[in-house]
Amino acid sequence: MPNIEIAQADEVIITTLEELGPAEPTTDQIMRFDAAMSEDTQGLGHSLLKEVSDIQKSFKTVKSDLHTKLAVSVDNPNDLMLMQWSLIRITIQEELIAKTAGRMSQNVETLSKGG
């Protein structure tokens, strides 16, 4: 095994915290910190709830439009087919959301159990 020589340090090394003194952040560090703190830090759960809320608002709008159309007697077969298609689409979307929410709750339960 070869010998390893370590050169003597010519600098004075600070070894205590008192010698270091208080740390002052730079202006760039302060700006980055302020920017990070001002961002939306609600997390994934908040964004999922916001999306579900937006979908709920969309459903309410579509359902109210459908109720308005149903209140008026429609004799046109095309309009009846469009209303039926809207109803089918709403039903399918609600079922998919219910299944997704059920699966997400199962995943959360699995994570909380630890595997």
Curated annotation (Swiss-Prot):
List keywords of the entry alphabetically: Plasmid, Virulence
Which BP terms in the Gene Ontology apply to this protein? protein secretion by the type III secretion system
Q: What does the record list as coiled-coil region(s)?
A: none
Give a single Pfam family match: T3SS_basalb_I
Q: What induces it?
A: At 37 degrees Celsius in the absence of calcium.
The answer to whether the entry has keyword Coiled coil is no
Q: Which InterPro entries match?
A: T3SS_YscI/HrpB
The answer to whether UniProt assigns keyword Repressor to this entry is no
Function, as annotated, reads: Belongs to an operon involved in the translocation of Yop proteins across the bacterial membranes or in the specific control of this function.
The family assignment reads: Belongs to the YscI/HrpB family.
> What is this protein's record name?
Yop proteins translocation protein I
Organism lineage: Bacteria, Pseudomonadati, Pseudomonadota, Gammaproteobacteria, Enterobacterales
